[in-house]
From Swiss-Prot:
Keywords: Amino-acid biosynthesis, ATP-binding, Cytoplasm, Kinase, Nucleotide-binding, Proline biosynthesis, Transferase. This is Uncharacterized protein YHR033W. One of its GO terms (biological process) is proline biosynthetic process. NCBIfam families: proB. It is found in: Cytoplasm. It comes from the Eukaryota.
Length: 423
């Protein structure tokens, strides 16, 4: 019996729009619609993250190249986004399916209640049998609040709704050890147990996105890392054969066996693992793809932790000592107090997300700048950078004496502190 999954399918501009003519690839869009409809009939819930608004706008306005001026790009996006969702609506309506457009910027999820509202809205649409089509709101986004690319947006969307799978559809069938277009000896990478350990023997520097898109393989690796941290399996596969998605899901559910050892191992062990998995794919007649395994329940981020680490924009940094860091990681889950803070960097307001770093404290209480500083997580500070600079290193009971008021005895409460998964 097939389990019902929540599946996010991300399509880049180069998958949906011809790079030279800027015209939509209606044949690919039709295949996507057929695939999503079939997945729904199998009982799965499906969300599409669709790029292409700017590219469709370029075609509609007969503009040959994407301009550099932000206001022009946003105007083009305003034209294209409406036309793009209209095409999706037209294609899905032929199968009796309803769609809904959701345009997001980071500004829409900067508050926890907004983040929850976005999740509730998408889940309500799924419960109604509607197919949400998500895109970044390029008409309103500015560099400070944009996701940067729809690979990242798709990972955040998948984490937002607690999806089971994230499919990143692209112009290659899988990840390779090098660019297969320029290196005939490039080997396919079909299974990555632990992305945080790096990819032994893999060069991901080539390929920086297309004329009509912003992504590349690097952005897909970032998205896969985000999704894995949220407990979501990520699959990279070729966009011109979306009908393979159900077959890959079926293979993972019924035939795939995770490797016995934890992590990627040495470079040779990693490459041997690829040969073993390739044999399995051939045995079950499963098309080539790259599978990034999800973190297990013990190591995956909770929803709020993911929001703090990946949904918010960091402003400034708080540097603490290593002993204080160890206490924050302990089972008692301590909150962050002023006496743990060695130094405050850059400017931030209260409840903004701040980079948390560890450094060495000198005998006089100041930061030892000769020692390395390491980023370890993020916090939402109860105090501004100016306030915190005045109370750093002090016990909590001194806050009122120094500031004349006390917002909290903590710089950040435990629920507003998040660390990447600890292995």
């Amino acid at each position: 019996m097939t389990k019902a999954y929540t599946i996010v399918i991300k399509l880049g501009s180069s998958s949906l729009v011809d790079e030279s003519t800027k015209e939509p690839k209606l044949s690919i869009m039709t295949l996507i619609v057929e695939t999503v409809t079939n997945l729904k009939r199998m009982g799965h819930k499906v969300i599409i993250v669709s790029s292409g608004g700017i590219a469709v706008g370029l075609d509609a306005l007969n503009i040959p190249h994407k301009p550099k001026q932000l206001s022009e790009v946003q105007a083009i996006a305003a034209v294209g986004q409406g036309r793009l969702i209209a095409r999706w609506n037209m294609l899905f309506s032929q199968y009796g399916e309803q769609t809904a457009q959701i345009l997001l910027t980071r500004n829409d999820i900067l508050r926890w209640n907004q983040y929850n509202n976005a999740r509730n809205t998408i889940n309500e649409l799924l419960a109604m049998g509607v197919i949400p089509i998500v895109n970044e709101n390029d008409t309103l986004s500015i560099s400070e609040i944009e996701f940067g690319d729809n690979d990242t947006l798709s990972a955040i969307t998948a984490a937002l709704v607690g999806a089971d799978f994230l499919f990143l559809l692209t112009d290659v069938d899988c990840l390779y050890t090098d660019n297969p277009r320029t290196n005939p000896d490039a080997r396919p990478i079909v299974l990555v147990p632990e992305l945080s350990e790096g990819l032994p023997g893999v060069n991901t520097s080539s390929g920086s996105g297309s004329e009509v898109g912003t992504g590349g393989m690097r952005t897909k690796l970032i998205a896969a890392d985000l999704a894995s941290n949220a407990g979501i399996e990520t699959i990279v596969m070729k966009s011109d054969r979306p009908e393979y998605v159900p077959k890959i899901v079926d293979y993972i559910q019924h035939h795939f066996r995770p490797p016995r050892h934890i992590g990627n191992g040495t470079q040779q062990q990693f490459l041997d693992l690829q040969d073993t998995e390739l044999e399995q794919l051939r045995r079950y007649d499963v098309p080539m793809h790259t599978k990034f395994l999800a973190n297990d329940n013990k190591h995956k981020l909770k929803n709020r932790e993911f929001w703090i680490l990946h949904g918010l924009i960091t402003k400034g940094a708080i540097i603490i000592d290593e002993n204080s860091y160890d206490k924050l990681l302990s089972k008692d889950m301590a909150s962050l107090t002023p006496n743990a803070v060695i130094e405050v960097r850059d400017n931030f307001h209260e409840l903004e997300c701040v980079d948390l770093k560890i450094g060495q404290r000198l005998p006089n209480g100041e930061l030892d700048i000769s020692k390395p500083i390491q980023s370890v997580g993020c916090v939402r500070s109860n105090y501004t950078s100016l306030e915190l600079a005045k109370i750093k290193g002090l016990p909590s009971e001194k806050i009122h004496d120094v500031l004349g008021y006390s917002v909290s005895e903590y710089v950040a409460h435990r629920e507003n502190i998040a660390f990447p998964p600890q292995f």
